[in-house]
Amino acid sequence: MASSMMASTAAVARAGPAQSSMVAPFNGLRSSVAFPATRKANNDLSTLPSNGGRVSCMQVWPPEGLKKFETLSYLPPLSVEDLAKEVDYLLRNDWVPCIEFSKEGFVYRENHASPGYYDGRYWTMWKLPMFGCTDASQVIAEVEEAKKAYPEYFVRIIGFDNKRQVQCISFIAYKPT
């Protein structure tokens, strides 16, 4: 028993110094020789990044009078052809088109300090979701019907993914004048 104990102690004693040499000692920061004290002045401005002079065409969104609603709200109002292209996009992705309408096109605070159910977060659904719809003209016809029934309301189109059960796209189809 004693001989086996001594053999294991000797093995541990031999392994100790070998393990400590596996980790390199910390030498501190690099020497200052690697960092030049002076830099050559570069007066050549042609090497600086540039946007190609396109700054003059950028515009600032006016803070008053123009509300941003949802996707594509920064664009001018969409024509019927543009709406049809967007609806075709959501149909190609196998999303279910839904049409909703609301008096206010944005969240507002009327009944409480934070928005609630009656403060524009939830829109009223126009009829039922259009399950099985394969043609954009069907959706456009429903939007036109909603516009006739509620001309002073906002109308939006939603693309709903029924596999993931999430809303994938939402955009304003009609803004009242």
Curated annotation (Swiss-Prot):
Keyword presence, GTP-binding: no
Recite the UniProt keywords alphabetically: Calvin cycle, Carbon dioxide fixation, Chloroplast, Photorespiration, Photosynthesis, Plastid, Transit peptide
Cell compartments where the protein resides = Plastid, Chloroplast
Q: Which InterPro entries match?
A: RuBisCO_ssu, RuBisCO_ssu_dom, RuBisCO_ssu_N, RuBisCO_ssu_sf
| Keyword Chloroplast part of the UniProt annotation | yes
Which molecular-function annotation in GO is an example for this chain? ribulose-bisphosphate carboxylase activity
One Pfam family this chain carries? RbcS
Gene Ontology cellular component terms for the protein in this record: chloroplast
What range is the organelle transit peptide?
1-56
The biological processes this protein is annotated with in GO are: photorespiration; reductive pentose-phosphate cycle
Top-level taxon: Eukaryota
Provide the induction entry. Accumulates to low levels when grown under continuous white light.
Oligomer status and interactors: Heterohexadecamer of 8 large and 8 small subunits.
The further comment given in this record reads: This protein is coded by one member of a small multigene family. The basic functional RuBisCO is composed of a large chain homodimer in a 'head-to-tail' conformation. In form I RuBisCO this homodimer is arranged in a barrel-like tetramer with the small subunits forming a tetrameric 'cap' on each end of the 'barrel'.
Protein's job: RuBisCO catalyzes two reactions: the carboxylation of D-ribulose 1,5-bisphosphate, the primary event in carbon dioxide fixation, as well as the oxidative fragmentation of the pentose substrate. Both reactions occur simultaneously and in competition at the same active site. Although the small subunit is not catalytic it is essential for maximal activity.
Q: Hey, which family's this protein in? A: Belongs to the RuBisCO small chain family.
Tell me the protein's name.
Answer: Ribulose bisphosphate carboxylase small subunit, chloroplastic 5
* Source species: Lemna gibba (Swollen duckweed)
What gene codes for this chain?
RBCS5
